[in-house]
Amino acid sequence: MRPLLQHFLQGQLSSIEVSEALQPSNTLIDVRTSEEHFQGAIPGSRNHPLFDGLERSLIGKLYRQVGREAAVERGTSIVAPQLEKFLNTLRPFQSRLLTVYCARGGMRSKSVTRFLSSEGFRVQQLEGGYKAYRRHVLDFLKDFRPPLIVLHGRTGVGKTLLIRSLPGSIDLENLAQHRSSIFGAVHLQPRNQKNFEGLFYSKTSSKPRKEFIFVEGESRKVGQVFIPEAFADAMKKGKKILLKASMETRVRRILEEYHPRDEETLFKIEAILPALKESLGKNVVEQLKTLLHQNKFEDFITILLEKYYDPRYEHGMRDYQYDLELSAEDLEQTQKDLIGFHSAQPIHGDKNQYSQS
């Protein structure tokens, strides 16, 4: 008969620090609740909850009000009937090196690590859990100021399309799952700050330290999340390139991006329009609704660009000075021009690029 999980609360334990745990050879197992995992998790980790949210809340209450022994006893009674099922969900990964984590490197991850070890798994615990990972990420982000080439231009000019195609780029909107506009969440599931920062760290921490990185010009906030302060500062100091394209080209690209032809998309777009009344006035918003209902999408987009997006862009960028201006009518040619500009940049100096200077 298999021992109860409480028998694995003490004993020898193999553990590693965050920097080791993030190596590609590790398979990360998050034993926190699905709610905790959703709120913030190490990118790529697999969620195998030991308890659900209600059970965890109950155990925590017992721990605070009665004591550790009562909490452990209740936790064991919850887990025991499900232990075989829990184990079976992890069997497909038995040949891999597993790293188990919970919130702070406490009882959940320790007991599971020892239990899996007794079952023949190669397994280790992440010291300090997700909290230690968050510290690690934030320590990196607070000083991350790489040399940047920042693409600017009006809405629809093709900045995001170029960022997706350029080597050595960071797609902030993809990391945030938001296009950084009033309609930016259509077709997407915006991420929260913790998950955005985790993915940002994963994308940037292994990049060459002195090479210029392409990034799209953004405000500090992208949808629901904020760009790390040090990186936002690097964007202000980076090489600035202005991209230009005709109204016709911009409308076509926006239409291809949003493809507002299905009923659900049209409903989401129409639901956002009332938020524009203060900027555009009631009459223009009603005109936009009419065009949407008539499937006159090109006219709909043109009015939004002329009356909303372009004036806001001109106001926000009026004091900018650019290192280069490029046509973005032919994105393949623009990409070649940008790569040429990148190649012409000197490798960032010997001084640490993360410094404040």
Name what the model sees in each region.
Residues 108, 147-167:
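Glycine-rich phosphate-binding P-loop
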Residues 43-44, 146, 234-239:
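Short glycine-/polar-rich loops that comprise or flank the Walker A/P-loop
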